[in-house]
Amino acid sequence: MANYPQLNKEVQQGEIKVVMHTNKGDMTFKLFPNIAPKTVENFVTHAKNGYYDGITFHRVINDFMIQGGDPTATGMGGESIYGGAFEDEFSLNAFNLYGALSMANSGPNTNGSQFFIVQMKEVPQNMLSQLADGGWPQPIVDAYGEKGGTPWLDQKHTVFGQIIDGETTLEDIANTKVGPQDKPLHDVVIESIDVEE
């Protein structure tokens, strides 16, 4: 299963473990620098420098995803460590499965600081059969069938990590009440992100 690191919850050699502390609990992820080096470097540097501390999940759509990482909390803000937007790092080894940590963007090669965590729990059966026909690897099709996810975002958003603990926190955040533009009525705050290398 080495080809598909998301299918294994153990932190493997070369992966980076991070713990995201929120006011709704903790979520633990493993990041994939071998798959998305610039994206992981961007996230880890921001995490270590406290860039994400106090930032909210400004967009929460239950049974789809939770999005954060924007200091302006508008969906329009946030910068990369590289000064401008940076390129996508798509891979045939990482997919937008349930619990994937993935980059938000506004089109090709527009990555900054915003990210989302996939929270869709079921992929429709007709879509699963299309994935197999469309060239998705069978272990990934099976994982989408078992875990859920958002396969239509594959090759459109860079996947650079996977939740390995704290799914209950992800669900709690996803179930928060929201108002206009899917913004939570009560702030869901990222207090800090610890990097364990």
Swiss-Prot record:
<dbReference type="GO" id="GO:0006457">
    <property type="term" value="P:protein folding"/>
</dbReference>
<dbReference type="GO" id="GO:0003755">
    <property type="term" value="F:peptidyl-prolyl cis-trans isomerase activity"/>
</dbReference>
<dbReference type="InterPro" id="IPR002130">
    <property type="entry name" value="Cyclophilin-type_PPIase_dom"/>
</dbReference>
<dbReference type="InterPro" id="IPR044666">
    <property type="entry name" value="Cyclophilin_A-like"/>
</dbReference>
<keyword id="KW-0413">Isomerase</keyword>
<dbReference type="Pfam" id="PF00160">
    <property type="entry name" value="Pro_isomerase"/>
</dbReference>
<protein>
    <recommendedName>
        <fullName>Putative peptidyl-prolyl cis-trans isomerase</fullName>
        <ecNumber>5.2.1.8</ecNumber>
    </recommendedName>
</protein>
<comment type="function">
    <text>PPIases accelerate the folding of proteins. It catalyzes the cis-trans isomerization of proline imidic peptide bonds in oligopeptides.</text>
</comment>
<dbReference type="InterPro" id="IPR029000">
    <property type="entry name" value="Cyclophilin-like_dom_sf"/>
</dbReference>
<feature type="domain" description="PPIase cyclophilin-type">
    <location>
        <begin position="14"/>
        <end position="195"/>
    </location>
</feature>
<comment type="similarity">
    <text>Belongs to the cyclophilin-type PPIase family.</text>
</comment>
<keyword id="KW-0697">Rotamase</keyword>
<dbReference type="InterPro" id="IPR024936">
    <property type="entry name" value="Cyclophilin-type_PPIase"/>
</dbReference>
